[in-house]
Amino acid sequence: MTLDALLQSLPPYAKDVRLNFSSLGREETLTAQQRDGLLVACGLASRNPDLARALEAEAAPRLSPAALAAAKAAATVMAMNNVYYRFTHLASNPAYATRPAKLRMSSIGNPGVARADFELWSLAVSAINGCGRCIDAHEQVLREAGVGEEAIQAAVRVAAVVASLAVALESVRAAA
């Protein structure tokens, strides 16, 4: 199903979701690659296959193969890291935070795109997955790279809208 068809399938109570999504395309603080990569990464992080396919179909033609792969890598490696580091952050035993993770994360070190773009995508996925430790780590890297608060907030806004779109689509499916 196309993105337009998914958006048209939203019920009246999801009007804000549809309007918020339409405003994402007018976001001026993000580059086109950042915005399109966010759509792909957040679509995957939403765990809604229909939405993930539609967002990738919408964004992929505007992304290089390397950027598309990096956006997917951000979603997949953050799925792992967000679980692991959220555990180390939330566990009552502080010893877990001092132990080595022993998890491969080579895509973080060599994402194939500008580091700031990959970090924005990772931050947004971390926001969807609710890992405060990862959010703080990615936000710090972005700020050190000179990325402004407006762009960081815009990336999280994309994540929030994609997450709400996934829930709205699930509500349609549940009612069917």
Swiss-Prot record:
Disulfide bonds join C131-C134. InterPro entries: AhpD, AhpD-like, AhpD_core, CMD-like. GO terms for molecular function: alkyl hydroperoxide reductase activity; disulfide oxidoreductase activity; hydroperoxide reductase activity; peroxiredoxin activity. It catalyses: N(6)-[(R)-dihydrolipoyl]-L-lysyl-[lipoyl-carrier protein] + a hydroperoxide = N(6)-[(R)-lipoyl]-L-lysyl-[lipoyl-carrier protein] + an alcohol + H2O. It is an enzyme of class 1 (oxidoreductase). Keywords: Antioxidant, Disulfide bond, Oxidoreductase, Peroxidase, Redox-active center. The active site is at C131, C134. Coiled coil: none annotated. Pfam families: CMD. Its EC number is 1.11.1.28. GO terms for biological process: cell redox homeostasis; response to oxidative stress. It comes from the Bacteria. Antioxidant protein with alkyl hydroperoxidase activity. Required for the reduction of the AhpC active site cysteine residues and for the regeneration of the AhpC enzyme activity. Belongs to the AhpD family. This is Alkyl hydroperoxide reductase AhpD. It comes from Methylobacterium sp. (strain 4-46). The lineage of its organism: Bacteria, Pseudomonadati, Pseudomonadota, Alphaproteobacteria, Hyphomicrobiales.
